[in-house]
């Protein structure tokens, strides 16, 4: 009871912020984008598809460390995700008997259906969420009986037709995937009747140079408050536009989460508590050095030395880097573990609202010493505790400012490019490959 009280008190700070500090933008439901699949503009494939691999000497007979750390096997005594549908908004999924994803739509290729992963990313996240077991190895997803829908929303392999690559700045090269298309993908997934949406992507921009993301905010509000979907998002990885945020200033006790110190906004992560924002940890339980900090981080989960299922349905633990295979890592995969847990909870507690599912995950997390911080939020998730603890359900809806807003005014001038362009990254891909040049440029809604 003492632990629950500490978490409940600390969670009040997750959404509290000084009036003078930066806060997530108010949501305008009137900015909801249409439910239309397809890319923002015609695209073409420019790069060969990537495939995951394995590190030398790897063995997969035992469960991955992350499953053991989170108690996944014990959690399956209470729920397996049966009857729950999870939408994976990512780079697509290569379906296999062990990752039996179904087509949910394609926002990269007009002729696609979501069941193609040229980036070796969406398949990995989907397998962590709901990969099926096999007698040949110890891998199993968090919610192995959940239904998977794949929505391909971004890809490094595709670019707008006629776009020109910049050999001196690959980050400036247009690629498929934008905040506009992400917003449409969220609406489409919600309308397909899913119970959980996983978004292992992040866009970062400076506080001093905000972007127009009204369509994304409206789509998240629609998914959560209208369609009743739990939306889980990655906190993001450092690199490129994602410059690490400083720690809260201890001399300002009125700002315990450090809203006044935020320098880099991460979206859609900063829409917490409407979404569940997930940071990363390593095998020691310490926060991952690459995991973006912020007052919006809600919980954490494993993000290093990840084992998943590849395009053939076999275990993998590496991606090809410049100098050979490198371990799979990133907050993408931390988010996938939490989405799997959300699916278990939706099966076990079908009457709980999205806000109450999120409350159960955060209230039962292994909280840090101070109860909550900007690295791991309320702490590392505890699957069995979330499924079994007797705790109050919490408020039916998350406190969030939803109101109709006037159209945003974009000031012309020398800073116009930073205002209208951000990097939308599948958070895990860039880090794992060790190639900063893989960060994609994506236009926000003007």
Swiss-Prot record:
Annotated gene: mycP1
Signal sequence bounds: 1-21
Xref: InterPro entries: Peptidase_S8/S53_dom (IPR000209), Peptidase_S8/S53_dom_sf (IPR036852), Peptidase_S8_subtilisin-rel (IPR015500), T7SS_pept_S8A_mycosin (IPR023834)
The entry's keywords: Cell membrane, Hydrolase, Membrane, Protease, Serine protease, Signal, Transmembrane, Transmembrane helix
Ranges of residues in domain Peptidase S8: 64-387
List of catalytic residues: 90, 121, 332
GO cellular component, one term: cell surface
Residue ranges of the region described as Disordered: 24-43
One Gene Ontology term from the biological process aspect of the record: protein processing
Organism: Mycobacterium tuberculosis (strain ATCC 25618 / H37Rv)
Protein name as it appears in the record: Mycosin-1
Subcellular locations according to the entry: Cell membrane
């Amino acid at each position: 009871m003492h632990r629950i009280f500490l978490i409940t008190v600390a969670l009040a700070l997750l959404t509290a912020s000084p009036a003078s500090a930066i806060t997530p933008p108010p949501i305008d439901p009137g900015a909801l984008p249409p439910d239309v699949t397809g890319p923002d503009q015609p695209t073409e494939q420019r790069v060969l598809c990537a495939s995951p691999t394995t590190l030398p000497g790897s063995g997969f007979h035992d469960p991955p460390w992350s499953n053991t750390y989170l108690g996944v096997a014990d959690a399956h005594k209470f729920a397996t995700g049966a009857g729950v549908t999870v939408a994976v908004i990512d780079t697509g999924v290569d379906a296999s008997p062990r990752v039996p994803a179904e087509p949910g739509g394609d926002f990269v290729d007009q002729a696609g259906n979501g069941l193609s992963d040229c980036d070796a990313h969406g398949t990995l996240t989907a397998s962590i969420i709901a990969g099926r077991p096999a007698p040949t190895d110890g891998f199993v997803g968090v919610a192995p009986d959940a239904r998977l829908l794949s929505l391909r929303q971004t890809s490094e392999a595709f670019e707008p037709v006629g776009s020109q690559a910049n050999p001196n700045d690959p980050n400036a090269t247009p690629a498929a995937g934008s905040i506009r298309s992400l917003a449409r993908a969220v609406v489409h997934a919600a309308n397909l009747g899913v119970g959980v949406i996983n978004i292992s992507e992040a866009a970062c921009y400076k506080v001093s140079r905000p972007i127009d993301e009204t369509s994304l905010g409206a789509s998240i509000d629609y998914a959560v408050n209208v369609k009743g979907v739990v939306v889980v998002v990655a906190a993001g990885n450092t690199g490129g536009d994602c410059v690490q945020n400083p720690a809260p200033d201890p001399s300002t006790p009125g700002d315990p989460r450090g809203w006044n110190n935020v320098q880099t906004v991460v979206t859609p992560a900063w829409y917490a508590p409407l979404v569940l924002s997930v940071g990363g940890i390593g095998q020691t339980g310490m926060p991952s050095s690459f995991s973006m900090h912020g007052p919006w981080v809600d919980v954490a989960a494993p993000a290093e030395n990840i084992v998943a299922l590849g395009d053939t349905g076999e275990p993998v633990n590496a991606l090809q880097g410049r100098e050979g295979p490198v371990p799979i890592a990133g907050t993408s995969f931390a988010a996938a573990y939490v989405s799997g847990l959300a699916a278990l909870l939706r099966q076990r507690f079908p009457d709980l609202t999205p806000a109450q599912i999120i409350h159960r995950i955060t209230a039962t997390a292994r909280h840090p010493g101070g109860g909550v911080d900007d690295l791991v939020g309320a702490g590392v998730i505890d699957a069995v505790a979330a499924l079994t603890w007797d705790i109050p359900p919490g408020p039916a809806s998350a406190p969030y400012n939803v109101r109709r807003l006037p159209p945003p005014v974009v000031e012309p001038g020398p800073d116009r490019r930073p205002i209208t362009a951000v990097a939308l990254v599948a958070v895990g891909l860039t880090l794992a490959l060790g190639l900063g040049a893989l960060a994609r440029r994506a236009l926000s809604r003007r």
